[in-house]
Every structure is written in C-alpha cells, then in structure tokens.
Amino acid sequence: MNYKPTDTPTSKCSVCVLGQFCLPVGLSSSDVTKIDTLVKERVHLQKGESLYRHGDPLSSVYSVRFGTLKTEYCLQDGRQQVIGFHLPGEILGLDGIGEGHYQSDAIALEESEVCIIRYEAFEDLARQIPVLQNQFHKIMSRELTQDQRHLLSLGTMRAEERLAAFLLSLSQRL
C-alpha cells in the first residue's frame, strides 16, 4: 500500500450519510453493530496520490467517503488506460479478490477520503450475516455489468456516442 491510515473514524457506518449505499437493507441492530466494527481506519488522499498500485497484495476494499478516484492500467508501452471512476458511496479494490493482488492502480483525482475495509474481516463477517454477503454479491454483479457495458460501447459506438454514454452513466451515479 502506498498510504498510511490517517485517522480512526469517529462516526460509524450506521450513521454515515453514505450508509444507504454501503449497508444492506433489513439488518438487525446487532448486525449493524457488528458491521460498525469493520471500518477501523480511513485514509485521506491528496490529488494524484495512490491508494494502491497494480501488484500490491489485496488487504482491503475501500468505500469512497468523499472525492473521486480513478482506476487505471499501465499498458506495456507505458501508456495509462483509465478503466473506472469511483464516486462517494462506491466500493473499489474488488479487482484484487480473484488473484490476491490488485489488478490496477487507484489514484485520487481530487482531495478524497476512503474507509478501509479489511477484506479478511469482511469475509468473516459476511459468513455470519448472509444479507451482507448478498449485498456484496450485488455490488460485484453491478461492477461486472458496468464492465460489460463499457466493453460493448468500445466495440460498437462512435467516439461521440461513447462520450454521451459515459456522461449519462456518470450523471446516473451522482
């Protein structure tokens, strides 16, 4: 990891304004209390600062609290290819789950803050709270669908159409 956790959250997930995006609906109060223990640290990033780099071992997934991050690949010829933008309430770092290390770089586009969700602790808790595991599956499914739409747009749309589709997607997420 290229960051050092900067603070311990004073507010809990259950009272965070972004909880509607991160927390599953229908949790019992005891489940909410357990989920509140997942986020023990946050990291504050300045514009251009990396959250993680391609090849870093998977340790956490991250929830964007404020700001915007991009994920990108470095191509063999040294060019950078942006593969995603991550807005408040969205999760990033999922690309590290399959191989055990991140497949992209995550970089702050502006001053940003993310909640650090240790993946191992999340997995343990998800086994205890099935609705949390279901929520995670939905998040991963949305990511796959978004990636498929992106691939479709690259293969079938003109540049103007791709730009319009990107702006529409971005406005729907805001």
Model regions and ranges:
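A generic structural signal for short hydrophobic patches within well-formed alpha-helices
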Residues: I91, F122-E123
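Cyclic nucleotide-binding regulatory module and flanking cytosolic helices
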Residues: M1-K47, I91-L92, I97-E99, Q128
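Polybasic "coupling" helices that flank or enter modular domains
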Residues: R127-L174
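Conserved active-site beta-strand element of glycosyltransferases/polysaccharide synthases
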Residues: C115
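Hydrophobic alpha-helical segments typical of transmembrane helices
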Residues: D31-I35, A121, F136
